């Protein structure tokens, strides 16, 4: 039977980025999906960036507006509105955004967890 997710849960993070989790450990723990998939809508301000990370999950990022920059061992990708990117678990990556900020959807398989993101300490 279909399950309506009436609203996301806003997850507080530093740096001005907004995370609205629709599916995952925080918003839908009773759905039985909390460990298999997470879906969140992100809004990042101009100039936002986060530390490098080596997640143990795959991530699909769909850019809705603006530009997401993805640093990886081979260089940097620019993903703009209407484009998407897939990163694989075990890859060292860093997300940031362009001068207009960005709005995007992140789908993590298995689900995102602070314990499995492998975020590096900022220097």
Language-model regions, residue ranges each:
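Ligand-binding loop in jelly-roll beta-barrel domains
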Residues: 89-114
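A short, N-terminal "cap"/entry segment at the start of jelly-roll beta-barrel domains
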Residues: 1-36, 119-123
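Structural motif
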Residues: 67-69, 76, 92, 101
């Amino acid at each position: 039977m279909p399950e309506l997710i009436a609203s996301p849960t806003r997850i507080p993070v530093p740096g001005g980025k907004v995370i609205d989790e629709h599916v995952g450990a925080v918003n839908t723990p009773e759905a039985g999906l909390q460990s298999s998939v997470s879906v969140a809508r992100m809004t990042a301000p101009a100039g936002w960036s986060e530390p490098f990370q080596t997640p143990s999950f795959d991530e699909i990022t769909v850019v809705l507006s603006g530009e997401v920059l993805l640093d990886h061992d081979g260089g940097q990708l620019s993903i703009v509105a209407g484009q998407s990117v897939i990163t694989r678990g075990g890859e060292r990556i860093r997300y940031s955004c362009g001068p207009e900020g960005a709005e995007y959807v992140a789908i993590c398989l298995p689900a995102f967890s602070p314990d499995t993101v492998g975020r590096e300490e900022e220097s």
